[in-house]
């Protein structure tokens, strides 16, 4: 099984704050899988660390009020290009991110409040027919049976 995975989940320090979201449940799940690490922001050459960004009225804006939507959309395009010739069975993406969030994203108020929504890369993958799951679903018992 070939699995596309947000690089931060596997311990790559590529989050906006220079840290990672290493998830041991995901690491264990992926032990016997072929893994393709992806970080759209890293592919696009975004700085690490960089200002926090959220989706505000459909556009990505950073915490300083700067519209960074074009940079994030470029990042998604680069990530899609990187995987275009891959036969990916599953994508496991980081929760809440304006790029990779699957079920929820931050609401754009920069207060930590969540709302139902999908990040730009997760949305693009779903639109192209990929099976996309939130990393937080990895611990659910039903997941392995459904893959």
Mark where each language-model region is:
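N-terminal glycine-rich phosphate/adenylate-binding segment common to multiple enzyme folds
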Residues: 79-109
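Short N-terminal binding/cap micro-motifs at the start of the first secondary-structure element
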Residues: 11-18
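Short, surface-exposed acidic-centric catalytic microdomains
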Residues: 21-62
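Short, well-ordered beta-to-alpha junction loops that form the rim of enzyme active sites
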Residues: 8, 94-97, 137
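Divalent-metal-activated hydrolytic enzyme cores
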Residues: 43, 52-55, 59-82, 113-147
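Extreme N-terminal starter segment of soluble prokaryotic enzymes
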Residues: 1-4
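Short amphipathic alpha-helices and their capping/turn segments at secondary-structure boundaries
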Residues: 22-35, 75-90
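Short, active-site-adjacent cap segments at secondary-structure transitions
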Residues: 11, 45, 98-101
């Amino acid at each position: 099984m070939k699995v596309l995975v947000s690089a931060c989940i596997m311990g790559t320090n590529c989050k906006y704050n220079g840290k990672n979201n290493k998830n041991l449940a995901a690491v264990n799940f992926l032990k016997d899988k072929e893994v393709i690490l992806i970080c759209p922001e890293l592919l696009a050459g975004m700085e690490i660390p960089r200002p926090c960004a959220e989706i505000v009225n459909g556009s990505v804006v950073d915490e300083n009020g700067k519209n960074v939507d074009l940079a994030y959309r470029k990042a998604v395009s680069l990530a899609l290009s990187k995987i275009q010739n891959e036969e990916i069975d599953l994508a496991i993406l980081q929760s809440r991110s304006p790029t990779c969030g699957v079920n929820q994203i931050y609401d754009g108020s920069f207060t930590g409040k969540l709302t139902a929504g999908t990040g730009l890369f997760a949305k693009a993958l779903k639109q192209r027919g990929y099976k996309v799951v939130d990393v937080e679903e990895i611990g659910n018992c039903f997941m392995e049976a459904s893959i």
